[in-house]
Amino acid sequence: MLLKFRSLFIVMIPILCWAGACDKNDNGAPVGDMPDPIKIDLRSTEKDMVSADQAFAFEFFAELFQEEALDEDKNFMVSPLSLSMALSMTRNGASGETKEAMRKTLNMDAFSDDDLNAYYKKLKEALLKTDPSTKLSIANAIFTNQSINIKPDFIHTNQSFYDATVKAVDFGHPATVNVINKWASDNTNGLIEEVIGGTRPEDLMYLLNAIYFKGIWTSEFEKKNTDRRPFTYENGIRENVDMMKQTAKFNYTADENMQLVQLPYGNEAFSMMVLLPAEGKKVQDAVTATRGEGYWEGLKSGLHQAEVELSLPKFKTEYSKRLNEVLTKMGMGIAFTNGADFSAMSDAPAKIDFVKQDTYISTDEAGTEAAAVTTVGMMMTSLPARPEKVVFNANRPFLYVIQENSTGAILFMGAIKNFD
């Protein structure tokens, strides 16, 4: 089976398509006699959630692909998992129409908040155990405005189910941006060093999810086989790139839309699925196909072992994107307006100011290193009333009273009239 990458292609690294939080598996054990992946047992409802998560992932990617279509040769990568987790934490602070819009956008409107939160918690715990040869870290954090009261139930829920680190900070201080960016860098092994450029006093909070992944191919490419080979863009232009090559047994399938090969990492708990559009078709055609109901699972059901003569280019992509417009198209536009209802988060009227994702991926002969940070910036739509500014200059005679505040009991009273 000959599989050469002659045009643009889509790569997917399913982290079992699921979620986690402020924990990590950083064993990085060498690939060899690895234990079998730990099977993740799911209840019927949880399987439905996985399917809903996958549908959201393909819908999100397709909408973003359309938005990036003007720049035909632009590489980009996103993490649907990171986005869904960050928005799920945010959803815990939403109420009414805003909450329903977010649930529908995430394709999770059929499930209760309790079920969703428990689902992410369960999957996180399983993800971090399934492959000791793969480094995996998934972290959540919430930075809140120290001047504003945040509702305890909102904090408790996100700490309990998402292991979110919560820290109250001064958004008016110029150094606060460094605290948030350092958290992002620390939780992506330094791959993503900056996610915001500054903070403002009117910011209510920042909710962040970070994912770091480093996987070693189960069947590594030999560097001696990598050489410069042509890669053909969709406009017909050819460019020589570093093309890795190997012939080995991989799971493979194909239909009228694309070829699909599955490249496993470590003990095969994780894999990169590479989708190559069929001859004469474009990446847009493959993206459109994946949006079809049941298409992805149907395609994967055809995977079978074949001896694949594989050519895959080395690649590295860094990407940053504000997602407000895409998420608005997907149905949660109300969350970005002054009509948003985040009353389960705080009594201060607030809306989502922005949702932004920063990503990094590098794939070479040894494997893949990837990271993503999703940042949800919340801002107050009306600032709390500022205290009246007055001048109190006791430069003339005055009285004073010393009292116990809760009862008003007066302990001492006096007058200051002179300083002779």
PLM ranges: what are they?
Residues 102-106, 221-228, 283-292:
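Short Gly/aromatic-enriched secondary-structure transition segments
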